[in-house]
């Protein structure tokens, strides 16, 4: 026994340690390498300083996806952010798959785990880190709001808000804080593969709402963090989008210049920051402008700290908006310990109809939403609120990366385009929104953002137990009404890259006749598969909206009606640059 145990111990010592993905090696001699199993369209869906997103086809399954190629050369000091995003997406995808396998469903209209961007595959090349995700429509929630000036309160704002509440409830139940919930990160599913369903055209319940709410997908987990497993200081970072950040994040401003003792005195924030951002987004959907934005970033941050947001006098006294104002008040609570949770908000009168089943099972825990006082103004040094849609355009931004464990920091500067739009300045004494909107002047100030399945998914309403979960198997032919979520069975391993190193990173195809490949090096990758590619596919356009100022999700989309405009802002983030340049082949 001793000899055997000793031999096993020696063998274990000789075995190479499993290296975390990505390897970040140009040669990667120790890792198994494969030729790329995807072909991409010639045109990119969007590109930016750090990454390019393209539509791609898996040459084995012929399904269409979005391929995000993150440039190693530009993210070398931020690789841990990409690793964090990848780890979270993979963990969430596995959890979703497990829930669908166990048929864990409720009878509510929205299931939170059905509305999160799905990660399908991932791999590394000499130049890029590549993520394969689901394909989404061109145009995000931001563009939808701006094109329509605002959304309909009763059919769109309530349903979109309810869907996002279900998403946050799921994420928070898994201990995950998103930290960058905003309109640009809310996408719409694009159903392009054979097994994906179309809306049935029927409403669930006895009230009408926009069925596109079933297509909502929350994306960009570049800033997301696990509340219970993150480093002690990772949730003391000044990160996010200025228009959407909560007061507890504002307190972290300048954390990069703080001493370890000062950092230690900061309170760790958590899931309530997403609830605050939800309030901002709900307000933005209803009015077409954000509640706290002022002339300068400092004024905006002061208004956030004091919960001083613009309230239109006419809208405030409109009975139609009564529950809306109460809902955003629940979100705009300065003390995060008192701020409502996503689970509580499901029972709020503003959106409770979308969760009638689960709410009926939790009547004893129904919170009281009637205690809030009348909305009041808070005096601050900011004399003007800026009524505007938060701009998607970008400006020169200084990014400070903070190594909070080591007490050191470094800064770098990212340059991007600038687009000017009119500002809407509103004096606090004006009583009419319409009068305020006539006072257009100056230039839109920029705000910051840091960043960036198939058969199954069935649910039997007829065999649900008293807890609202299904007792039937996934073989039932019934599906959740109007839900457009589908979960792929695990694809065959030979059709995936699964984190390997690819010798041919990008095989391009025009997805059409004739069969053309953009470069000779790529043609060798798909030579034996090229006859399998469906040459009848026509080019499609889609987009995964995100931001161009980070190493995670950075690209733009434009259309004729609304040129793409991205957020911009200054931020500090905890990054351990332990990999070093020597591990990267640039």
UniProtKB/Swiss-Prot annotation:
Family, similarity comment: Belongs to the protein kinase superfamily. Ser/Thr protein kinase family.
Assembly, per entry: Interacts with RIM11.
Misc note: Present with 10200 molecules/cell in log phase SD medium.
Reaction(s) catalysed by this chain's protein: L-seryl-[protein] + ATP = O-phospho-L-seryl-[protein] + ADP + H(+); L-threonyl-[protein] + ATP = O-phospho-L-threonyl-[protein] + ADP + H(+)
SMART domains according to UniProt: S_TKc (SM00220)
Subcellular localization: Cytoplasm; Nucleus
EC number assigned by the record: 2.7.11.1
Gene: TDA1
Protein name (record): Serine/threonine-protein kinase TDA1
Main location: cytoplasm
CC annotations in GO: cytoplasm; nucleus
Disruption phenotype: Leads to cell death when overexpressing the camptothecin mimetic TOP1-T(722)A mutant.
InterPro entries in alphabetical order: Kinase-like_dom_sf (IPR011009), Prot_kinase_dom (IPR000719), Protein_kinase_ATP_BS (IPR017441), Ser/Thr_kinase_AS (IPR008271)
Lineage per the UniProt record: Eukaryota, Fungi, Dikarya, Ascomycota, Saccharomycotina
GO terms (BP aspect): cellular response to oxidative stress; signal transduction
Entry function: Serine/threonine protein kinase shown to have protein phosphorylation activity in vitro.
List of residues that carry Phosphothreonine: 504, 538
GO molecular function: ATP binding; calcium/calmodulin-dependent protein kinase activity; calmodulin binding; protein kinase activity; protein serine kinase activity; protein serine/threonine kinase activity
Positions contributing to ATP binding: 45-53, 68
Keywords from the named record: ATP-binding, Cytoplasm, Kinase, Nucleotide-binding, Nucleus, Phosphoprotein, Serine/threonine-protein kinase, Transferase
A Pfam family matched in the record: Pkinase
Active-site residues from the entry: 180 (proton acceptor)
PROSITE patterns xref list: PROTEIN_KINASE_ATP (PS00107), PROTEIN_KINASE_DOM (PS50011), PROTEIN_KINASE_ST (PS00108)
Boundaries of every Protein kinase domain copy: 39-351
Keyword Protein biosynthesis: no
Modified residues (Phosphoserine): 509, 518, 578
Annotated stretches, region: Disordered: 1-26, 503-524
């Amino acid at each position: 026994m001793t000899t055997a145990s000793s031999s096993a111990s020696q063998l274990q010592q000789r075995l190479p340690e499993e290296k975390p993905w990505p390897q970040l090696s140009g040669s990667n001699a120790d890792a198994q390498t494969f030729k790329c199993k995807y072909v991409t369209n010639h045109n990119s869906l969007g590109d930016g300083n750090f990454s390019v997103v393209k539509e791609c086809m898996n040459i084995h399954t012929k399904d269409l996806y979005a391929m995000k190629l993150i440039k190693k050369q530009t993210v070398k000091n931020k690789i841990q952010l990409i690793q964090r995003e990848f780890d979270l997406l993979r963990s969430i995808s596995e959890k979703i798959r497990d829930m669908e396998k166990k048929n864990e469903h409720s009878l509510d209209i929205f299931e939170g785990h059905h509305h999160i961007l799905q990660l399908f595959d991932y791999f590394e090349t000499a130049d890029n880190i590549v993520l394969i995700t689901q394909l989404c429509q061109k145009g995000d929630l931001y563009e939808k709001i701006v094109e329509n000036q605002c959304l309909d309160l009763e059919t769109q704002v309530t349903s979109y808000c309810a869907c996002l509440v279900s998403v946050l409830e799921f994420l928070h139940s898994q201990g995950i804080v998103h930290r960058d919930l905003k309109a640009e990160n809310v996408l719409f599913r694009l159903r392009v593969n054979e097994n994906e369903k179309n809306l049935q055209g029927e409403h669930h319940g006895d009230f009408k709402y926009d069925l596109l709410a079933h297509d909502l997908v929350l994306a960009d987990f570049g800033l997301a963090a696990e509340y219970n497993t993150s480093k002690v200081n990772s949730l003391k970072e000044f990160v996010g989008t200025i228009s959407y950040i909560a007061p507890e994040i504002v307190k972290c401003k300048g954390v990069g210049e703080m001493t370890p003792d000062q950092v230690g005195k900061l309170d760790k924030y958590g899931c309530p920051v997403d609830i605050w951002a939800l309030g901002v987004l709900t307000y933005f959907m209803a009015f077409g402008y954000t509640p706290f934005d002022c002339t300068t970033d400092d004024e905006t941050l002061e208004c956030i700290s004091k919960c001083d947001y613009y309230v239109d006098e006419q809208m405030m006294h409109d009975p139609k908006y009564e529950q809306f104002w109460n809902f955003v008040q629940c979100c705009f609570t300065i003390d995060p310990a008192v701020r409502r949770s996503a689970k509580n908000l499901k029972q709020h009168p503003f959106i409770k109809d979308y969760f009638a089943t689960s709410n009926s099972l939790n009547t004893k825990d129904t919170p009281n939403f009637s205690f809030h006082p009348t909305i009041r103004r808070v005096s601050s040094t900011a004399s003007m609120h800026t009524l505007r849609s938060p701009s998607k355009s970008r400006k020169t931004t200084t990014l400070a990366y903070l190594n909070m464990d080591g007490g050191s920091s470094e800064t770098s500067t990212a340059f991007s385009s600038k687009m000017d739009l009119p500002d809407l300045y509103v004096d606090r004494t004006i009583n009419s929104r319409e009068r305020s909107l006539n006072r257009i002047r100056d230039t839109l100030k920029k705000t910051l953002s840091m960043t960036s399945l198939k058969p199954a998914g069935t649910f039997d309403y007829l065999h649900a137990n008293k807890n609202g979960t299904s007792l039937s198997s996934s073989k039932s032919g019934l599906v959740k009404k109007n839900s457009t979520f589908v979960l792929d069975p695990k694809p065959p391993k030979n059709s995936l890259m699964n984190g390997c190193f690819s010798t041919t990173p990008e095989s391009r195809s025009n997805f059409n006749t004739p069969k053309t490949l953009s470069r000779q090096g790529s043609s060798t990758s798909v030579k034996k598969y090229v006859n399998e590619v469906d040459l009848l596919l026509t080019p499609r356009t889609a987009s995964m909206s995100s931001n161009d100022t980070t190493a995670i999700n950075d690209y733009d989309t434009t259309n004729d009606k609304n040129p793409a405009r991205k957020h911009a802002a200054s931020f500090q983030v905890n990054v351990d640059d332990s990999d070093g340049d020597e591990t990267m082949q640039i």
